[in-house]
Amino acid sequence: MILLAFSGELFKRINTSPIVHVERRTNPTTTVTVTTKPSPTPISPNQCNTNKIQCCNSVQSSDAPLLTGLLGLLGIVLQGVIPIGVTCSPISVIGIGGNSCSAQTVCCENNTFNGVIAIGCTPINIDL
């Protein structure tokens, strides 16, 4: 379970697919459903610098309502619509034991937000 805070209220993330269902944790219960645009065309791993490879629970468009709120809370202003990785962890070396990704393997341009988000993510066509 992933908890997100918006304007001091807690929300519980129900799943990690690109379609995100968020449930408000205060009464009365409010449900928000967000759908996103398809991800960019996958690239091969050798097209990505290894320190940019991430395993993200989902990749969503920066204009998705859930992400616009989160980006605002983090003080991030983006130009244009950009694919954003959500709840990411780095993958250091492909093929070495312990580096598995059961979610979405992506190559991201900006990974400086402690795994909460990663900016400019493109799917990598590989099974880890």
UniProtKB/Swiss-Prot annotation:
Pfam families: Hydrophobin. GO terms for molecular function: structural constituent of cell wall. It comes from the Eukaryota. It is found in: Secreted; Secreted, Cell wall. The keyword Glycoprotein applies. Disulfide bonds join 48-107, 55-101, 56-88, 108-121. The keyword Membrane does not apply. Keywords: Cell wall, Disulfide bond, Glycoprotein, Secreted, Signal. One of its GO terms (cellular component) is extracellular region. InterPro entries: Hydrophobin, Hydrophobin_CS. Glycans are attached at residue 110. Belongs to the fungal hydrophobin family. Self-assembles to form functional amyloid fibrils called rodlets. Self-assembly into fibrillar rodlets occurs spontaneously at hydrophobic:hydrophilic interfaces and the rodlets further associate laterally to form amphipathic monolayers. Aerial growth, conidiation, and dispersal of filamentous fungi in the environment rely upon a capability of their secreting small amphipathic proteins called hydrophobins (HPBs) with low sequence identity. Class I can self-assemble into an outermost layer of rodlet bundles on aerial cell surfaces, conferring cellular hydrophobicity that supports fungal growth, development and dispersal; whereas Class II form highly ordered films at water-air interfaces through intermolecular interactions but contribute nothing to the rodlet structure. This is Class I hydrophobin 19. It comes from Pleurotus ostreatus (strain PC15) (Oyster mushroom). The gene is Hydph19.
